[in-house]
Amino acid sequence: MKKIVLMCAAVAMLCACTKSEERTYRVTVEHPHKDCPVVVTEVPAWAESVVVKADGVELPSQLDKCLAEAAFVADVESVKEFEVIFSEKPSTTEYAPRTNAQMWWKTGDEANPYEEKDTLYSFKDDMYRKLHHHGPAIESEWGAYRVYFDKKQTIDTYGKKKGQLELRESMWYSTPEQLSAGFGHDNLRVFGSIGVGVLKGWDAEEKKMIHITDFERREARVLAKGPVRAIMEMEVEGWNYAGRKIGMTSRYTIFAGHSDVVVENFLEGDVEGLTFVTGVMKMLDTQSIKEERAVAQIGCDHPENDYTKWPKETVALAVALPEEVEILSAEDDQLSYLYQLTPNAEGVIKYHFDMNWRKSEWLSSLSDEELLTDVLAKAKAAAEPIVVERVK
């Protein structure tokens, strides 16, 4: 009995010594936000888990140690405070996943054809056909996106018919049985366009986009898979662009409850004064709205080259640029509606993009014009500032 008592006392002392830190954060928004994405920075290096509460109720959250950030989503009308507790003890709580990220290496083994990877790199432009769905992909319940691991690094879109996670089952290419069960599918052919929301180089004299062809190393990464946000990155080192050797990391983040994506481009080296472009592609039967800091288009085209199998799809795309982004011009090319941008003093260009799809059940009652104005409004709302400040 004495031995048991001593053991219990030792366990109690161990529990009492577990390191933790409780903070209070205030989140402020300009307009009401459902599933407002909140990111807490300056996470303690020793933290292994996080718990977030609002009005005493625990909210799903995640700790992304590779970024030293914690993230959660919550409904915020105007101003709301949250209790954030960091602990050195790993979490035993599993929240229902609302986001996913994945990248699959083709093994060549018929029994196990794909191996999931979080990081892949190459010194050549040879990865496009070595990866299933050609690069990393992220999804929420409302949409999915992949980035091509090639010289274009274009974003491609996957529409959802129902609000659900499904990429780990469909693997981007839904089977006839899955389509019959209400799965979504690839709904866009990007050709040589900007697609939606990727950052590319720009040749001002030729008035055309520049792909990443001359480089030293390129890497694709999955940084976070959920439950409340998923993150993928594409990094290029030693890119010979406009007579300079630079580096660029493009980070794409999708949050639970959102179809919009946050894009953060981090540029390194001698990038002052360089021009880059982003925007949305033009499509057949297109309608568009182009404003000073946001552009949207809706069009109809076949998502694949097999026209008999894949009928035309109606897709609306939008990009919105926050006030802090420096816009040099807004000159389009033949395939895309574009903005010419330059990085800020820290070498960063940040913006948001979004997609609407005619076959999404929650959008089926909208006209084409309403799909267009809705996707533009969502992208612009996503680009509004969300202020997160520690108050205790």
Regions found by a protein language model. Give the residues of each.
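Positively charged n-region of N-terminal signal peptides that target proteins for export
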Residues: 1-4
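C-terminal motif of bacterial Sec signal peptides marking the signal peptidase cleavage site
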Residues: 15-16
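Alpha-mannosidase-like glycoside hydrolase catalytic domains involved in N-glycan trimming
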Residues: 20-121, 125-126, 133
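Solvent-exposed beta-strand/loop surfaces of large extracellular or lumenal domains
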Residues: 49-70, 240, 284-302, 319-329
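Beta-strand-rich recognition/accessory modules
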Residues: 64-76, 317-392
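Solvent-exposed N-terminal domain segments of exported/luminal and surface proteins
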Residues: 88-212
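Extended, loop-rich substrate-binding clefts of extracytoplasmic carbohydrate-active enzymes
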Residues: 180-255
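Acidic (Asp/Glu-rich), glycine- and aromatic
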Residues: 248, 260-291
